[in-house]
A protein has these predicted regions:
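N-terminal subdomain of lithium-sensitive/metallo-dependent phosphomonoesterases centered on the IMPase/IPPase/PAP
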Residues: 1-17, 87-90, 141, 168-169
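DPxDG-like acidic metal-binding loop motif
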Residues: 6-61
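Short linear motifs in intrinsically disordered/low-complexity regions
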Residues: 2, 61-62, 162
């Protein structure tokens, strides 16, 4: 990585192996590969591949259909869940689910297997950029927990927190923290 990228309007952000711990554990499928393009800090294209199950989610894939919400499933880190997910689940009468990689968690929301993904343990741009690109293209909400937008290609690549969720749940989820 070079800070020369800060002078570019278009920057590729790649995570060749998201979910290293899960990749190392035999039988786990919750690891991913991320590729995203940002333009002026905004993710405009992205793909999240989950090779172990032979699936790739792309920002140009319009197959995503969001089902009626029957229960609120809040997905969080398998190894570093933090209290935020439980707080949201309690406030929205939901239940907690845990998975490994950020890509696998975000794609669970994209595919309708969860409604909310919250992360408070800190990540880096490469952990969330492609999942956010796919989520936004799928009609989901993606932001920081204070509701501010996620801006990429920053000099400090640390992203302290993240919320990806169904749009109709965004206000309720954000209200828990604001």
């Amino acid at each position: 990585d070079s800070l020369e990228r800060l002078g570019s309007d278009r920057v590729w952000i790649i995570d060749p192996l998201d979910g290293t711990k899960e990749f190392e554990e035999a039988g786990r499928t919750d690891w991913a590969v991320h590729v995203a393009l940002t333009e002026n800090g905004i993710p405009t294209a992205g793909a999240v591949a989950i090779p172990s199950i032979g699936t790739t989610f792309c920002s140009n894939d319009k197959r995503t259909k969001h089902k009626e919400i029957r229960e609120v499933r809040v997905i969080c880190s398998r190894t570093r869940p933090g209290p935020a997910a439980q707080i949201i689940a309690d406030k929205l009468s939901g239940r907690i689910m845990r998975l490994g990689s950020a890509g696998a968690k975000a794609m669970a929301v994209v595919s309708g297997d969860a409604e909310i993904y919250v992360h408070t343990g800190g990540q880096y741009e490469w952990d969330s950029c492609a999942p956010v690109a796919v989520a936004l293209a799928s009609g989901l909400h993606a932001s920081r927990l204070d509701g501010s937008p996620l801006i990429y290609n920053q000099s400090d690549t640390y992203v302290p927190d993240l919320l990806i969720c169904r749009k109709e749940l965004a206000d309720s989820a954000l209200a828990v923290f604001n």
